[in-house]
Amino acid sequence: KGPVMADTPMRVGKNGNLFYMYKFRSMVVGAQDLLQKNPELLKQYKKNSYKIHNDPRVTRVGKYIRKFSIDEFPQFINILRGEMSLVGPRAYYPFELEEQQKKYPQSRDYVKIILSSKPGLTGVWQVSGRSDINFDKRVEMDAQYVQRRSVFYDIYLMLKTIPAVIFGRGAV
């Protein structure tokens, strides 16, 4: 029970502009509050590059829609609004960028490159293991995408997205 859309924190878009990224709710209502109130869960979340394997906040339906990326479908609204593109770097949380750049100072230059582009519904990170990849490698991959993007590379990544979604690779 509860709202269909997720109540997630704002994300960082092109040029550092904040936007609300639409997603179907896959967690219990108040999941962010639960995370903040549970020190052990918060520690695990931060330690694992802002992902929790077997997250207790994810609902039964949520596990399914996450595995097959169905929760991401509403991001087409963000694309129509001009906040995102079909292909691009991942849309990060502001606190994630801030804290992870402290942990991985070498990532700062990569983040600057990433923020010169709109985040994407899919991208190199999404088709290369998703939640199995740590922040420092993720931003490096996203920055490399921004530097070499082209129509053909975007088509290649969109085609690689199909099996990643069908087989639910790397989803948490």
Language-model features and meaning:
Residues 1-172:
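Conserved small/aromatic sequence motifs within transmembrane helices
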